[in-house]
């Protein structure tokens, strides 16, 4: 790095200078959403908002001591029987804002197929299903999660149990509506669309239209979204009746207790700086965001070869493996989740200490959703964005939209350089292993599966190198280990 330090220093100075110019040129324009109640209302407890005692008890069991801002804003309207459209910053407690009124109504009028929740991703569907089950554990709730990548026959059996709540992705739900004998939603009382902007961005309009045609017009509808796009506005007009509008965020808002930094690095040492950052924060849970599925796998394999407890999560993994990686990270059996933007929205992983943008997000809103995986529910967190000489323009655009300059993350260059040789060796070995995996797939040969990586053997089995001498996470790889009122149908 010494032979290029001069040019790297010049690049850094240009970068810092351009940041200042760019931020003076442009003021962020945030999207203000109309509120029904403009005056500030004193914080109330769940009981004071009208939540019934069984559900207040359930909230307490889950550690929800007081309503979040979106819950404070949405629950009074929802409990009065109104349709609701809510915009809230990530990690704001949206699930509780729609689950509580649904369950309260279900207690008074128990029936099967009471509520349908539509989500854009499988992982979010499972998470919402788990939260419904946790809230309804004391009242005999039955919930079913219906998503792609899972056997249709097994799902048909789950629907035959006549669950109270169905949480589904639009495509698979339409498959069952069209093909599963005896299944219909003619008696549905609630429709909830969570992450509605993302549902529409993923081209589910055709499926949504089919679903809206076969459910009752006389229903209550809640629509929750991170942003108010033209498509969301159109969907609101088509599916909601005189909704109460609540908002606790703007388009590019991040939570106050999130410390945001950038680190400017030469592209050829990008992996080394990532290893340095993870070592600096050893013992903390971290999500590392990558741009592609291939990069995600390669970085995860590289980190495991260096002895770090990393698991991948991306769209090309089977549903079983995706849930396996997610559950290991959520249970703290693994410290590092390396993923694409599949994990950037909606997933509730409360213990994330740090987010690293290894690859630059393509849009400002993607940046907000990524860093929103940490500093959730009142906790503090740190987000560090890796900026190379090729990312400067995209990064300056993000800063301008945020309306603030991020602090530079200070590092000791000599300590980074100590890691170069081993990191480069691990990176090369990861490439070799990835190439072998591709060749095995093409040839159709079977190989022993690893719990974390799907089609790789125990990561780094041939090349694994501990990094205890680096003073960081280290170890031999591997896992940490060790570590009422009832309703009828």
Curated annotation (Swiss-Prot):
Entry's EC annotation: 3.6.4.13
Taxonomic lineage of the native organism: Eukaryota, Metazoa, Ecdysozoa, Nematoda, Chromadorea
KW Membrane (keyword) present: no
Protein name: Putative ATP-dependent RNA helicase T26G10.1
Domain of life of the source: Eukaryota
GO biological process: rRNA processing
Keywords in alphabetical order: ATP-binding, Helicase, Hydrolase, Nucleotide-binding, Nucleus, Ribosome biogenesis, RNA-binding, rRNA processing
Domain Helicase ATP-binding: from-to ranges: 75-246
């Amino acid at each position: 790095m010494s032979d290029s330090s001069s040019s790297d220093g010049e690049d850094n100075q240009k970068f810092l200078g351009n940041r200042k110019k760019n931020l003076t040129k442009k003021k962020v324009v945030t999207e203000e959403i109309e509120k029904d109640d403009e005056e500030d209302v004193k914080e109330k407890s769940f009981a004071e908002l009208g939540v019934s005692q069984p559900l207040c008890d359930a909230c307490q069991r889950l550690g929800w001591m007081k309503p979040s801002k979106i819950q404070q804003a949405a629950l009074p309207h929802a409990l009065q029987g109104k349709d609701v459209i809510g915009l809230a910053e990530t990690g704001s407690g949206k699930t509780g804002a729609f689950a509580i009124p649904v369950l309260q109504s279900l207690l008074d009028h128990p029936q099967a197929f009471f509520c349908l929740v539509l989500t854009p991703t499988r992982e979010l569907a499972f998470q919402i299903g788990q939260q419904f089950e946790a809230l309804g554990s004391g009242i005999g709730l039955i919930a079913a999660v219906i998503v792609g990548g899972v056997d249709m026959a097994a799902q048909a059996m789950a629907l035959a149990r006549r669950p109270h709540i169905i949480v589904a992705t639009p495509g698979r739900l339409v498959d069952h509506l069209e093909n599963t004998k005896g299944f219909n939603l003619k008696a549905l009382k609630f429709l909830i669309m969570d992450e509605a902007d993302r549902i529409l961005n993923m081209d589910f309009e055709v499926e949504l239209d089919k679903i809206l045609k076969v459910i009752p017009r006389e229903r209550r509808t809640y629509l929750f979204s991170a942003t108010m796009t033209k498509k969301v506005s159109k969907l609101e007009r088509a599916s909601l009746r005189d909704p109460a509008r609540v908002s606790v965020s703007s388009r590019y808002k991040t939570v106050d207790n999130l410390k945001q930094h950038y680190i400017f690095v030469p592209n050829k040492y990008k992996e080394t700086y990532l290893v340095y950052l993870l070592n600096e924060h050893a013992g903390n849970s971290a999500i590392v965001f990558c741009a592609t599925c291939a990069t995600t796998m390669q970085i995860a394999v590289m980190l495991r070869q260096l002895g770090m407890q990393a698991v991948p999560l991306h769209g090309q993994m089977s549903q079983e493996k995706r849930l396996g990686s997610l559950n290991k990270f959520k249970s703290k059996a693994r410290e590092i989740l390396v993923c694409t933007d599949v994990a950037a929205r909606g997933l509730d992983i409360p213990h994330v200490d740090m987010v690293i943008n290894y690859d630059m997000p393509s849009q400002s809103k993607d940046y907000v959703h990524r860093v929103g995986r940490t500093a959730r529910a009142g906790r503090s967190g740190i987000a560090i964005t890796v900026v190379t000489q090729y990312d400067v323009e995209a990064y300056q655009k993000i800063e301008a939209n945020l309306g603030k300059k991020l602090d530079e993350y200070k590092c000791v260059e000599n300590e980074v350089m100590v890691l170069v040789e081993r990191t480069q060796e691990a990176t090369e070995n990861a490439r070799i292993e990835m190439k072998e995996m591709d060749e095995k797939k093409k040839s159709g040969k079977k190989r022993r599966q690893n719990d974390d990586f799907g089609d790789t053997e125990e990561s780094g089995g041939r090349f694994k190198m501990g990094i205890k001498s680096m003073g960081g996470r280290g170890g031999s790889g591997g896992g940490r280990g060790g570590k009422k009122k009832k309703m009828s149908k």
